[in-house]
Structure formats: structure tokens, C-alpha cells
């Protein structure tokens, strides 16, 4: 197959929205991270719930991870 016959790859996410996605995803991730820290500091060992801790930390890590991914794409580090 020749190079001219191939179709050009286009990203499923428009690069113009990388900055917006970065800010929104990182803001949501930092909110859940702060919520996790406040939960850990204000709860006693008797009132802690491991499933709530895992859920909050999982959501925070997902949003922060995708936020960092789009941050790298925004600055030109294409991974």
C-alpha cells in the first residue's frame, strides 16, 4: 500500500480543547484529592470506611491521571 493511498490519522479529541480538558480534569482531580485528605484528617479510626477511601482515591487518581495526560499533550509531548 502506497503512502498517498493511506488516509491521514485524526485524533478523536480536537487539539484545540486540550487546555480546557487539562484545567477541568485537574480541577476535578484536585477537588477529590482535597476531599480525601480532609476525610482522612477528620475521621477517627472507628468512623473510617475503607470502601469510601478507595472510591474517593480511585476517582481522584483517574481525573488527575487524565488531566496530566492532556497536560502533556497540550505542551507538545505526544505519548
Curated annotation (Swiss-Prot):
The gene is TMEM258. It is found in: Membrane; Endoplasmic reticulum; Cytoplasm. One of its GO terms (biological process) is response to endoplasmic reticulum stress. InterPro entries: TMEM258/Ost5 (IPR007915). The modification N-acetylmethionine is found at residue 1. Pfam families: Ost5 (PF05251). It comes from Bos taurus (Bovine). This is Dolichyl-diphosphooligosaccharide--protein glycosyltransferase subunit TMEM258. GO terms for molecular function: oligosaccharyltransferase complex binding. The chain crosses the membrane at residues 17-37, 59-79. Belongs to the OST5 family. One of its GO terms (cellular component) is oligosaccharyltransferase complex B.
